[in-house]
Amino acid sequence: KKEGYLVGNDGCKYGCFTRPAQYCESECSLRKGTGGYCYAWLACYCYNMPDWVPTWNSAKNRCGK
């Protein structure tokens, strides 16, 4: 199990600034996580997700590239 920021197919974090309050928690649950929240109103952070779920990594960041 791991935690971290959800990323999309483009390698960018899931934004949540304009999303409903439960958006991140729902997205994390869809990926078998046990919860999550919108960190600083910018990106979804999830807890206890399976290792196969892609999460943001500064060393492997490819957002916008």
UniProtKB/Swiss-Prot annotation:
The keyword Lipid biosynthesis does not apply. Coiled coil: none annotated. Expressed by the venom gland. It comes from the Eukaryota. One of its GO terms (cellular component) is extracellular region. It is found in: Secreted. GO terms for molecular function: sodium channel inhibitor activity; toxin activity. One of its GO terms (biological process) is envenomation resulting in negative regulation of voltage-gated sodium channel activity in another organism. SUPFAM superfamilies: Scorpion toxin-like. Keywords: Disulfide bond, Ion channel impairing toxin, Neurotoxin, Secreted, Toxin, Voltage-gated sodium channel impairing toxin. Beta toxins bind voltage-independently at site-4 of sodium channels (Nav) and shift the voltage of activation toward more negative potentials thereby affecting sodium channel activation and promoting spontaneous and repetitive firing. This toxin acts on human Nav1.4/SCN4A and Nav1.6/SCN8A voltage-gated sodium channels. This is Beta-mammal toxin Tma1.
